[in-house]
Amino acid sequence: MGITVRNLHKRFGEFAALDDVSLDFPAGELVALLGPSGCGKTTLLRVIAGLEHADSGQVVLQGLDVASVGARERQVGFVFQHYALFRHMTVFENVAFGLRVKPRRERPSEAAIRAKVHELLSLVQLDWLAQRYPSELSGGQRQRIALARALAVEPKVLLLDEPFGALDAKVRKELRGWLRRLHDDLHISTIFVTHDQEEALEVADRIVVLNHGRVEQVGSPQAVYDHPRSAFVYEFLGAANRLDGTVSGNGFVAHGAAQAIAVDADFAGPARAYVRPHDLELAAPHARAQGIAADVRRVVPLGGSVRVELAARSGEVLEAELDRNAWRALALDVGDALTAVPRAVRVFPAR
């Protein structure tokens, strides 16, 4: 089922949680709402679910304005960050709950409920835990059971509010891949909230970046990462080095640098340039005409890569990320002088 929201406004006192938000969510897509705390992503999810009401604007499900439709009638499945499983019920009973509390005329037979629950537990690969209680499960298992419970009532839309936020990093990574595979099997329209950039980039078909209640950018993960429309989007989507300087006909000149760096810019004047740590190449001093003079401040091994912290002569602190072969070839020590050469630079007007 496709979802459309039009001109949504929602305030909590003086705070604008949603400020004229309009979006289309095509049927069958897995869409991430990404942004910092307080950006409006959870409020938007709750308005779509019917758990909050917008001050103005429309929510359209299957072509119908559902402003006057309650949460229960919207046929939406909702999964919270903190599982919300019933502690006194077994896994089986938790998943069956939504089916058993349906109105009598809509309620399946007990045999049909049993079959449905076992089907869903098999889908989330936890059928063997049917008679366990939530206290006997790991965090990752509880969240998969919560998802099975949401799917039991066959929702038209699945809404996930930071579903993996309470889990440790290793389990989160495993469940991200599992959620993507599950979505590919079910093709149910899904919107999930996250502040984890890596999670959004890995799992989603499309990303909606929100900031201060407004939509900053919408697009595929690759498009949003490679072509950010604002400095906020660039910085939020991953580690970034920031350089202040000026754009002129020769390119971008960082404060304190002698040489311009070639950039693609449609403006001139004060600017802020960004470069990812993995796009910062390190070379011997004066080895490159275009580059930033810097000294090594710290070297941090990170498993398969090495992070090198640099003190630029212009005063900025920069980070470069090298693979271990490049690091060994450079034989860097703290205090060494070098030239940092940006391979891919994005510039935005200074504000």
From Swiss-Prot:
Main location class: membrane
Ranges for domain ABC transporter: 3-237
Domain of life: Bacteria
Pfam families given in the database record: ABC_tran, TOBE_3
SMART domains, per database record: AAA
Cellular component GO terms held in the UniProt record: ATP-binding cassette (ABC) transporter complex
Residues that, per the record, bind ATP: 35-42
GO molecular function annotation: ABC-type sulfate transporter activity; ABC-type thiosulfate transporter activity; ATP binding; ATP hydrolysis activity
Catalytic activity line of the entry: sulfate(out) + ATP + H2O = sulfate(in) + ADP + phosphate + H(+); thiosulfate(out) + ATP + H2O = thiosulfate(in) + ADP + phosphate + H(+)
EC nos: 7.3.2.3
Localization per Swiss-Prot or TrEMBL: Cell inner membrane
Class of the enzyme per the UniProt entry, highest EC level: translocase
Membrane topology summary: Peripheral membrane protein
Keywords: ATP-binding, Cell inner membrane, Cell membrane, Membrane, Nucleotide-binding, Sulfate transport, Translocase, Transport
Family under the similarity heading: Belongs to the ABC transporter superfamily. Sulfate/tungstate importer (TC 3.A.1.6) family.
Subunit text: The complex is composed of two ATP-binding proteins (CysA), two transmembrane proteins (CysT and CysW) and a solute-binding protein (CysP).
Biological function: Part of the ABC transporter complex CysAWTP involved in sulfate/thiosulfate import. Responsible for energy coupling to the transport system.
NCBIfam families: 3a0106s01
Protein name: Sulfate/thiosulfate import ATP-binding protein CysA
Source organism of the structure: Burkholderia mallei (strain ATCC 23344)
Organismal lineage: Bacteria, Pseudomonadati, Pseudomonadota, Betaproteobacteria, Burkholderiales
